[in-house]
């Protein structure tokens, strides 16, 4: 478990919520802000942080999507769905507007990047989880071939077409 997940278990899972259809995008933004402020005030996440959000699926799927979004996507990567990509940028700006910065001090650098992964869910309720990944996310990706050749990649490209839901059916 990351520090943010272990700490949130102690504080009654403030990184997970069941949203209702009437909550809409505003409900997503409100829960995001509630979580970021709680993490920042208590020092539960290393600020500035990479934020991963899982939306949809069952509770366990939602948590996995959020962790993958935080830990596996590289900074600057955008969701292939244009509306989700816009929401990622909007939440990043929103997180940086709360007046908290590095180590919980006053500032405008709470969020380095915000990544969202979406899963299928029932229309009666929508799971949402928020996860913080430390700024010092050290990672290297290499592929070892059968002939002994090693190739390194800058982008780990974890999300295949099979793993990622490419589009969301938006209701007008």
Tell what function each PLM region has.
Residues 1-7, 11:
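Single conserved hydrophobic/aromatic residue that forms the stacking wall/gate
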Residues 10, 116-122, 126, 132-140, ...:
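Active-site loops and adjacent core secondary-structure elements that bind or stabilize anionic groups
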Residues 12-44:
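Internal alpha/beta scaffold segment
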Residues 24-31, 62-91, 143:
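Gly/Ser/Thr-rich active-site loops/lids in small-molecule metabolic enzymes
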Residues 33-41, 71, 75, 89-101, ...:
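Generic secondary-structure signature for well-ordered alpha-helical cores
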Residues 39-50, 77-85, 98-113, 171:
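Flexible, glycine/charged-enriched surface loops at secondary-structure junctions
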Residues 42-64, 120-134:
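Conserved phosphate/anionic-ligand binding catalytic regions in large, soluble enzymes, centered on
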Residues 77, 84-90, 103-105, 113-114, ...:
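Catalytic or ion-coupling anion/metal-binding cores of large enzyme and transporter domains
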């Amino acid at each position: 478990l990351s520090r943010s997940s272990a700490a949130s278990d102690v504080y009654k899972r403030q990184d997970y919520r069941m949203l209702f259809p009437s909550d809409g995008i505003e409900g997503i933004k409100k829960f995001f802000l509630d979580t970021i402020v709680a993490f920042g005030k208590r020092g539960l996440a290393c600020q500035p942080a990479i934020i991963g959000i899982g939306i949809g699926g069952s509770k366990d799927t939602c948590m996995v999507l959020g962790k993958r979004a935080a830990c596996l996507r590289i900074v600057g990567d955008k969701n292939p769905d244009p509306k989700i990509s816009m929401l990622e940028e909007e939440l990043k700006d929103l997180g940086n507007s709360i007046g908290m910065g590095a180590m919980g001090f006053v500032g405008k650098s709470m969020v380095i990047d915000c990544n969202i992964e979406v899963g299928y869910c029932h229309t009666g309720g929508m799971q949402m989880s928020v996860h913080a990944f430390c700024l010092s996310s050290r990672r290297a990706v290499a592929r070892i071939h059968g002939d002994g050749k090693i190739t390194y990649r800058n982008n780990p490209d974890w999300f295949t077409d099979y793993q990622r839901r490419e589009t969301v059916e938006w209701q007008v």
